[in-house]
């Protein structure tokens, strides 16, 4: 899963921001209050939207008025994410806009998934929804050609605050959407704590670091036993950067 760019509009401090040509590993630096945590919370917000709905995600952050950029009440919060499931696969664009209806309840104003194969030609619209109603590719969708050949039919979601990529069952096995859903569902922000990382938990098992890093010794043991060449490379780089290792 490779995210190439992300646009953010009216999400807290980011009234209009874009990160383009994002590498596989990126470092974001800035003073306190410049939006580093808010930038990563975008994925936390999408995670909560996908797990439940947009009203739940907004409520978790104090409601629409606390999330919308200052001075832009009544406008929509929107995101545009461009990604590829892998290097050689088509570029997928996911667009999401969230706003208030006539009852001041948050709804999905616009949700679009489209993909492009090659540099020329119009993109294929996978789905396009607004306020719970829209059109989507119909049938058994697994490969890209399945979407290209599929008939588009109008459909209605259970609620206008639910994401279509969650509410439409035909997309659960489609590689483009399943990869994006997995990224969003598995997303979390680590808060690495050095005191917790010093703890030793020999009896546990872990392949990945936890959010606070308290299982560092367990993951280190796993790498040492299962990937010795990677472990030696880590030690080599530590010796270059940390005196006395």
Please state what every model-predicted region is.
Residues 88-236, 240-241:
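Electropositive, glycine-dotted interaction segments
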Residues 69-79, 210-219:
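Short, charged low-complexity intrinsically disordered segments located at boundaries
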Residues 79-86:
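Short beta-strand segments that buttress and anchor functional surface loops
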Residues 4-7, 32-33, 38, 57, ...:
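Short linear sequence motifs
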Residues 244-245:
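Short acidic amphipathic segments
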Residues 9-11, 69-71, 86, 155, ...:
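Generic marker of residues within folded, mature protein domains
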Residues 1-78:
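Pre-Walker A-like glycine/lysine-rich segment at the N-terminus of P-loop NTPase domains
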Residues 46, 81, 96:
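Hydrophobic/aromatic pocket-lining and membrane-interface residues
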């Amino acid at each position: 899963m490779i995210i190439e760019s992300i646009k953010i509009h009216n999400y807290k401090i980011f009234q209009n921001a874009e990160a383009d040509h994002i590498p596989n590993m990126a470092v974001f630096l800035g003073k306190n209050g410049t939006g580093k945590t808010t930038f990563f919370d975008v994925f936390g917000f999408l995670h909560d939207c996908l797990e439940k709905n947009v009203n739940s995600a907004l409520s978790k952050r104090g409601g629409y008025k606390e999330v919308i950029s200052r001075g832009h009440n009544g406008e929509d919060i929107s995101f545009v994410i461009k990604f590829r499931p892998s290097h050689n696969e088509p570029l997928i664009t996911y667009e999401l806009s969230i706003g208030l209806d006539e009852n001041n309840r948050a709804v999905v104003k616009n949700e679009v998934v489209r993909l492009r194969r090659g540099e020329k030609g119009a993109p294929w619209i996978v789905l396009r929804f607004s306020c719970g109603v829209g059109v989507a590719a119909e049938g058994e969708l697994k490969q890209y050609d399945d979407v290209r050949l599929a008939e588009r039919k109008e459909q209605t979601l259970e609620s206008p605050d639910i994401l279509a990529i969650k509410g439409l069952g035909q997309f659960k096995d489609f590689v483009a959407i399943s990869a994006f859903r997995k990224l969003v569902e598995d997303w979390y922000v680590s808060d690495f704590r050095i005191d917790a990382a010093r703890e030793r938990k020999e009896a546990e098992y872990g392949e990945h670091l936890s959010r606070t890093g308290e299982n560092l010794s367990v993951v280190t043991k796993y790498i040492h036993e299962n990937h010795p060449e990677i472990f030696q490379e880590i030690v080599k780089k530590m010796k270059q950067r940390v005196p006395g290792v």
